[in-house]
Amino acid sequence: MPQKIKELQDQLERIIKGKKDITDKILMAVLAKGHVLLEDVPGVGKTTTALALSRLMGMEFNRIQFTPDVVPSDVTGFTMYDKQSGQFSYRAGAVMCNLLLADEINRTSSKTQSALLEVMEEGRVTVDGETHCVPSPFVVIATENPVGSSGTQLLPESQLDRFMISVSMGYPDHQSLVDLLRDRQRENPLENAKTVVTREEVLELQKQVQEIYVADQVLDYVAHLAEATRNHELITLGLSPRGTLALVRMAKAAAYMKERDYVIPKDVQDVFKDVAAHRMILDSKARYQEKTAREILSEILADVAEPKVEG
């Protein structure tokens, strides 16, 4: 469905000005059956991006604003006694949708975060001994305000590892901001967003991405990159096996969006930092040297030899 992908990209670019590289990465994560962490200051388009995706991809959308008083049952749902029927019935929580916007996830308790964790990993919730599966496709887009903002706390490593990628929207450049201001004088492009692909077509796209071929040389390259993060002197926690699998899945989605049925090293390189950066725990020496995870990962990309792959 190359034409459908192109139309999705065009519509996202029309709604989110000047952020095609970021919206493309988010679209790749959806195609790769992954979850997305958006780390940024308020007001740069995180919520609009999630809403646009849900409308363009025909997904049922829910949003939960994480605050200290949000409890696990708000996320997973709960059982309630029905006096008329004399039975307990399940009342769905926020996760019973196709696309969940988990807003300001680092403002809530660790217990509530853990409730979301099970759903992200397993695609189901357990309430009072009963298991309930979420609809397919299922994607969580979580937003996180910068650590140090009022009321925020660090997400645990186990939670961060569940997100396929982490990206930052950033402020728009000057021309994109002018375009946004001009467009919003007339209408909000989001209000006129129409479905480009149905939920069934999204599932088919995900299946096609899964079938993209990855040569052994590329898998070997991915393994070398992962090992380099674990052996780097400035990194105390490198890329986990789950993270390494996520890297392969994102590389497949990158190849698919470039209309290729096989992965090349450039696909891996293009998504490596988005997959790995939020999973890294840096040594104190890195902080002393004022090096970020992305800067160190760029050095790793430069150091690890790229394999020759026949196209």
Report each predicted region and the residues it spans.
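Walker B catalytic acidic pair
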Residues: 40, 103-104, 115
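Pre-Walker A (pre-P-loop) alpha-helix and adjacent loop at the N terminus of AAA/AAA+ ATPase modules
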Residues: 2-44
